[in-house]
């Protein structure tokens, strides 16, 4: 009988830790530290454990992609083995529970010293390798012990100044120094937490370049401040915060190792974790390639994205903050948010990974895009992008149990007040005589592509209408007419038809959606279908959509 201890690691309070600041450099450093805490630092902690106990350990390296590499802990050769790090968790095996506790102490100490603000949660459980399922033990730990420990954890109360002290501008904790001057940002008071985040920015940037840039794109840099995200001088400038998350990936991780032997479970989880991580990286690489290909040099030697706006000092108007795996957050120029989110979802679908039955299956995902003014509070924008992503996921679940990629967005031309549901109830719900129920001005969320004949709320349909408004002779350069149409749509079908007739719009119809169930022309002539307006979203997005692939 071979007994081992399973350890599962997780972190809590990550969102406020990463996104609580309105300074991009602090967000960048925070994201890097979180990724290190339960991955590379866990491997390093195993190395330190080895030195303390003078026994061999094995820290599986996914970069080498050898999921069955020896030595194995069940062969009595190891004191500890890293099973996998992925899906938000890190799982390890120890030959003795004391080693598991010792390892956790080593890792916890480093996090306290180098990443104050990250809360590590660890649970341990002994199990019999020969008679128990490792898969089941890990599932029980995650569903029961880990959740219970998170709920019962007493939130830490940081010790504030005991005398006359200055406070950090970002965290309101006791300041320990001043930040270094960076670009136009003057030095400011910082706490130790912010100090560590800023110290990590260089390493975060280097890692991002190594993972995502190739020989074509390596001349470009990732921006460290939002003002370098493509901001146009003299214009109102916007930044887009995009959060994307795979559909049902938690369940996919749960089911993947089911009904396998313990060693086969370890191999399977390593393969799945590696393939999901690589899928996300590959999708982001393609996003960058398409963005780089869209940058053109004009007659004055200025580099512009599709001729629309200039990029400064070779800074790409795009920056991933959380990446690797199916859970991704990136920021970009506000005019690129919708397009880059759609490209990312499309490219992610092209990266099939093995399913529980061993057959390749594409990753479907949803994305939420929140476009706000450049210096709008970042934490709030991220929170809304998460809400929008959840909205898109609910849309997928409501559609007859089909699995597809979808996206939802909000374009905040001014401020934001309330949740997404409150904003839409207040600004996008109208009572018009054509429908008994309250009608919806927005067609969002939309599916990435047409899945069946009746689908019309699709990315292709939406972008076709936006481009028509921007380029067709009936509408191009006639912004007042478009704005007038937007207000008329609020009044319903009859008012819309009168508008089309009075303005002598060709065929007395709005831009056609791709044909669906024979209703495309009907929608174009009325502007509404089944209580949903097909054109309000497109009009709103005219200044926030640039096609990069045409």
PLM features per residue range, with description:
Residues 1-550:
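Regulatory and interdomain segments flanking nucleotide-handling catalytic cores
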């Amino acid at each position: 009988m071979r007994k081992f201890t399973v350890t599962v690691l997780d972190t809590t309070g990550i969102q406020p830790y990463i996104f609580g600041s309105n300074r991009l450099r602090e967000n960048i450093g925070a994201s890097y530290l979180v990724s290190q805490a339960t991955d590379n630092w866990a491997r390093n902690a195993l190395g330190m454990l080895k030195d303390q106990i003078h026994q061999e350990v094995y820290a599986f390296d996914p970069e080498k992609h050898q999921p069955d590499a020896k030595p194995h802990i069940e062969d009595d050769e190891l004191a500890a083995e890293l099973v996998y790090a992925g899906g938000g968790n890190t799982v390890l095996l120890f030959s003795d529970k004391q080693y598991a506790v010792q390892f956790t102490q080593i890792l916890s100490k480093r996090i306290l010293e180098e990443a104050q603000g990250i809360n590590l949660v660890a649970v341990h459980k002994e199990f019999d390798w020969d008679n128990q399922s490792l898969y089941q033990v890990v599932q029980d730990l995650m569903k029961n012990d880990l959740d219970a420990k998170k709920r019962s954890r007493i939130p830490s109360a940081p010790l504030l100044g005991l005398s006359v002290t200055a406070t950090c501008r970002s965290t309101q904790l006791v300041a320990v120094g001043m930040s270094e001057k960076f670009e136009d940002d003057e030095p400011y008071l910082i706490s130790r937490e912010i100090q560590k985040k800023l110290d990590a920015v260089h390493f975060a940037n280097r890692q991002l370049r190594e993972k995502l840039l190739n020989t074509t794109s390596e001349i470009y840099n990732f921006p460290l401040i939002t003002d370098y995200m493509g901001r146009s001088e003299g214009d109102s400038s916007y930044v887009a915060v995009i959060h994307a998350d795979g559909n049902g990936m938690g369940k996919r991780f749960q089911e993947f190792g089911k009904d396998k032997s313990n060693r086969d479970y370890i191999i399977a989880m390593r393969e799945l974790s590696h393939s999901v991580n690589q899928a996300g990286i590959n999708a982001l690489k393609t996003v960058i390639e398409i963005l780089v290909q869209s940058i053109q040099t004009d007659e004055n030697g200025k580099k512009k994205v599709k001729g629309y706006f200039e990029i400064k000092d070779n800074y790409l108007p795009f920056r991933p903050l959380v990446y690797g795996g199916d859970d991704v957050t990136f920021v970009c120029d506000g005019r690129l948010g919708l397009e880059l989110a759609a490209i990312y979802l499309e490219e992610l679908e092209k990266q099939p990974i093995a399913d529980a039955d061993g057959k390749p299956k594409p990753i479907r995902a949803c994305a939420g895009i929140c476009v706000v003014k450049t210096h709008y509070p970042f934490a709030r924008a991220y929170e809304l992008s998460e809400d929008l992503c959840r909205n898109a996921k609910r849309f997928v679940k409501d559609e007859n149990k089909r699995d597809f990629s979808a996206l939802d967005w909000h374009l905040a031309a001014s401020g934001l007040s309330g949740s997404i549901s409150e904003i839409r109830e207040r600004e996008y719900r109208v009572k018009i005589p054509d429908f008994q129920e309250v009608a919806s001005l927005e067609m969002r969320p939309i599916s990435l592509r047409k899945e069946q004949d009746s689908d019309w709320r699709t990315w292709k349909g939406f972008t076709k209408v936006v481009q028509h408004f921007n380029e067709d002779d009936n509408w191009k350069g006639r912004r007042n007419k478009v704005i007038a149409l937007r207000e008329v749509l609020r009044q319903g079908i009859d008012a819309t038809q009168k508008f089309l007739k009075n303005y002598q719009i060709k065929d007395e119809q709005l831009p056609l959606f791709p044909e669906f169930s024979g209703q495309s022309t009907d929608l174009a002539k009325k502007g509404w279908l089944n209580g949903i307006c097909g054109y309000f979203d497109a009009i709103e997005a005219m200044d926030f959509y640039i096609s990069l692939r045409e």
